[in-house]
Amino acid sequence: MKGISKVLSASIVLMKLKGVYSTTVLCGDSTQGLQGTTQPSYVLVPSAPETIANCGYSPQNMYVPSTPTTMPSTVPGTTGESETPTSPTSSPTEDVGTCKIAVVKHCDAPGTSSTPCEPEQTLAPSQPVAATIATPLVVASVQTPQAAVTILTPKAVSAQPATIISPFNQAPGYYNSAIPGQILTGNVLSPSASSCQVVPGTTGSSTPQQLPGAVSSGTIPCQIVQGTQSSGNTPGQQFLPGIVPVGSLQPDQATSGTPTPSVSQSQSGQQCCCTPPITNPVMPTPMGISSNGYPSSTAYAPTLGQLGPCIDTQKSTSSCEPKEKPVAQYGMEACAAPTPTAVLGNAEYLLSPGMYNSLNSPCNACCQQQC
């Protein structure tokens, strides 16, 4: 019953947010390039998983529908105890294919919380709970321990080709060697920033560089990259793969990028990088996020990795819970393999493939700035 009440409360919250998300589609058959230009950065999964067709920058991200399951029917006005499954052998699971829901444990960043991360929670096997769907959006998928979680690997993916997004349709960021959708580790650009920023340290030909943070509005388009030495005490330079170097190269300088005719020339010893010319998406206003529109912990990463089993993100022992706004106080109970999510308070929002993800909860920054 506890799980049902949380799901129902989530449905009410999503009704309030209907104006923001009701017209948003994660992926679709009819519109190509939708992810790159018109989609907001925070996207909830649509209620009809079969509409998710173009979910990929790689075969691992393709949508592969599994065998449909029969959902228990509920008569309006009745309680969970009176629900009658249409099939005694049906399993209350949600078909979300490889565009799956991923849940991140809701706890403060390491070393900043007075309470440790809460242990994983499971549902009692004696109380099967039906998944509740808030049309037109999937709110949650509550499963019993007997409901197996299908983690699709590349071997399980069908032969359907993944949608390749053109470089100029991608989200802003730093991309590796012209591979669509592959993003180097580092922070996002602020909306008013120009396309280059300092990359300290030695740059290897295949080592992703940790960018030092969002650049300020006064950053010039090209800045010097400090790298290895070319001769004596003269600093040498190397170039990130896929970033366009221009101008004359000094001895021992190297590049694996491809110059682009449209890129303006710069002085010797500098580098320029190309950022797709699209507008940075902005956080929906009901979330109460200010500044440049991103959570404090939003960062690019090449992969998310395994994010763990089914847990409840609404923890009563969280040090920030009493200070968070009610509109974000609901939990999503779901089991899945990695799909980028943004953690806003106690809420988890799915992001389209290759967009932004939040690996650590911005709970601390929320409380420090607003409370």
Curated annotation (Swiss-Prot):
Comp. bias (Low complexity): 65-94, 255-270
Translocase in keyword set: no
Disulfide bonds: none
UniProt subcellular location: Spore polar tube
GO biological process: one example: sporulation resulting in formation of a cellular spore
Keyword terms of this UniProt record: Glycoprotein, Signal, Sporulation
Segment forming the signal sequence: 1-22
Post-translational modification (record): Glycosylated.
Source superkingdom: Eukaryota
GO-annotated cellular components: polar tube
Disordered: region residues: 65-95, 229-270
Chief localisation class: other
Function: Involved with PTP2 and PTP3 in formation of a polar tube through which the infectious agent is passed on to the host cell.
Note: The host antibody response is directed against the post-translational carbohydrate modification.
Protein name per its UniProtKB record: Polar tube protein 1
Source organism: Encephalitozoon intestinalis (Microsporidian parasite)
